[in-house]
Amino acid sequence: MSAFVVAYFPHLCLAFGGLLVLCLSMARSVPAGFYPATAALFAALPGLWAVAGPQGGSPIACFYAGLLSVIALATIALLARYAERRGFAGDALYGLLLWSALGMLLLADADDWIMLAVGLELASLCLYALIAARLDDNLGTEAALKYFLPGAMALAVLLFGMALIYAASGSMEIAASLAAPGPLTAAGLALVLVGVGFKLSLAPVHLWTPDVYQGAPAPVAAFLSSGSKAAAAAALLHVCSEVSPEARELLWPALAVGAGLTMAVGNLGAVAQASVKRLLAYSSIAQMGYILMAAMAVNDGGGEAALFYLAAFALMDLAAFGAVGALSAQIGDRDDIAAYRGLGYVHPWRAGVLAIGLASLAGLPPTAGFVGKFLVFGAALSAGYVGLAAFGIITAVVGVFYALRLLAALYMRESLIAHPAAVYAAGPAGTLALGVMAAGLVGLGLFPQTLLGAIAALFGGA
């Protein structure tokens, strides 16, 4: 087997798997893409761990490659029965999902600016179509446009920043170009961080997030929140690890303000929401503020904390959005908090998964979210960001209220429910995915060293 095939084996599995599924969508009238899409991801899984990346890879890229497979597999499992019951099932969904996952993998693997931009846009273009997958749903079409239009502007800002960095350094490699000090490099890096910050929903470029998450189908919102943000976070961590000390002195104060603003906007915004999907959207914004705080300390021990929190975030968002989809009726997603009253008694298994996801998002023990926040705050304190860490702890306490609000609705007295809420069957694959997510959140909360040891080994081999 050639070196090219070995190096790019995971990418080839996703690329040809997506192509095969799209060809099936044209050749068959009955959707059958679930099985080849799942097979493509399982085929790529050994290579994702064996190959850290096309250029030798980094610990971040190697870790993210494994995480991506879990995110994509869980999304396919959650999407299968959901799309079928809502009348928009088709093989094209799975093909687009595989190609979007390919873009995310390229983004995480990127060692040069061109690959970073290509991966970012490949993932985004497929997500635009997935968000608007149900053509008779005006809310989904509107959400896709609200993601596409500001996304195009963010790409322009990102590319302009890359052009400035290239003009200052003469190199398209991320590490080499950021090593060149100077105001032009710092200006370009600032624009790049704004572009990546849009994908991460960092304040103040976060305004698209609640509308898009509310309009997207719940499993697609789960993939958008966990996969897209994990890919962008991997790129952010890589870039931050290569920034010169001179550029840090110029830009890190602005990043600290952005992290604090993101944590505050996300948690306070979630408290004020009556829509469950908008609540989860604001919660995901807040989580990215914690990731940004860890990214600032990536060279001071924050890298391991960031990767643990990234894995926990992916699991908690998949669990929460997946449970929302599983608790929804055939017509549309159950989105009003009032509609969740007493579902903990009517549908205890699905409500329990949502409760675990919410508890982890709020950082309550014994979940992975609690351990992740503890590690992130510890890394920030060790790096000297005492004020930012203290502010983050305050916002995390505020964030507990939105979780308790929805949890209180879920477990309101059964006697107050006038009519049992009908939901669709999640199917064996969806049920298994929800169970794995919930077990993972509790397992990592009780035994965090299992994942922390693997992450430490990756950094030790860097």
From Swiss-Prot:
Q: Which reaction does it catalyse?
A: a quinone + NADH + 5 H(+)(in) = a quinol + NAD(+) + 4 H(+)(out)
Q: Where in the cell is it found?
A: Cell inner membrane
Q: What does this protein do?
A: NDH-1 shuttles electrons from NADH, via FMN and iron-sulfur (Fe-S) centers, to quinones in the respiratory chain. The immediate electron acceptor for the enzyme in this species is believed to be ubiquinone. Couples the redox reaction to proton translocation (for every two electrons transferred, four hydrogen ions are translocated across the cytoplasmic membrane), and thus conserves the redox energy in a proton gradient.
Q: Which UniProt keywords apply?
A: Cell inner membrane, Cell membrane, Membrane, NAD, Quinone, Translocase, Transmembrane, Transmembrane helix, Transport, Ubiquinone
Which GO biological process annotations does it have? ATP synthesis coupled electron transport
Identify the species of origin: Solidesulfovibrio magneticus (strain ATCC 700980 / DSM 13731 / RS-1) (Desulfovibrio magneticus)
Q: Which family does it belong to?
A: Belongs to the complex I subunit 2 family.
The EC number(s) attached to this protein equal 7.1.1.-
Query: Transmembrane segments in this chain: where?
Result: 4-24, 32-52, 60-80, 88-108, 113-133, 148-168, 178-198, 220-240, 251-271, 279-299, 307-327, 351-371, 374-394, 416-436, 439-459
Mode of membrane association: Multi-pass membrane protein
Designated name of the protein: NADH-quinone oxidoreductase subunit N 1
Chief place where the protein resides: membrane
Pfam annotation, one family: Proton_antipo_M
GO CC, any one term: plasma membrane
- The encoding gene is nuoN1
Q: Which domain of life is it from?
A: Bacteria
